[in-house]
Amino acid sequence: MSKIINSVEQMQIEIDLLAQNVVRNVARIMTEKLKDFIDTDVYSYPETWGGRTGDFGNSWEYSEPIFDFGYVESIISENLMKIQFDGAWSHGSNYSRMEEFNLAEIINNGLDSSNFNFPAIESRPFWDNWMMWANTEFDNLFISESKKYGITMNRSLSFK
C-alpha cells in the first residue's frame, strides 16, 4: 500500500521513521550476536560454583533509537540492575561491592588473583571477539537492513 506524502515535513518524518527502524534492527541483531559470544565464550565453560543464573548474558540490551544532532543512534550497554546480587558470594553483593570495577571487564580480561569474590580466572574474551565481529560485519549488516526499507544511509560505528 502506497502512502501519499503531501509535504516536505511529512516526507522527513517518514524517512526518520525508516531510519529508526533500520537502526533498531541493527542494534537488535548486534545485541543478539553479543549474547551469542557470551554463550560461547563465557557460558561454555563448565560450571564449578553452582547456581549459574545466566543473568550476565541477559544483562545486555540496546536503547530505542533516538535522533541526536541529525544522527539516529542506539546504544548497546550492560544493565547491571538485571543481575541478581544476593548471597555472600554474589559478585558485587553487600559483602564486596563492584563499584570501581566492571563485571564485563573481569570476565573479558580475567583476573590474576582473587578479587571481588572472584577466584583468579582466565580471560573469556567475549567482548574482544564481539568487537572483531562488529568491526568486520557492521557495514554489511547496516547496508542489508537499509535495503529492506529501500533507503541508503551513511553509517558509523563508535565504541565508548
Predicted segments, located by residue:
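Short, Lys/Arg-rich flexible segments
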Residues: M1-I75, L80-M81, Y95-K160
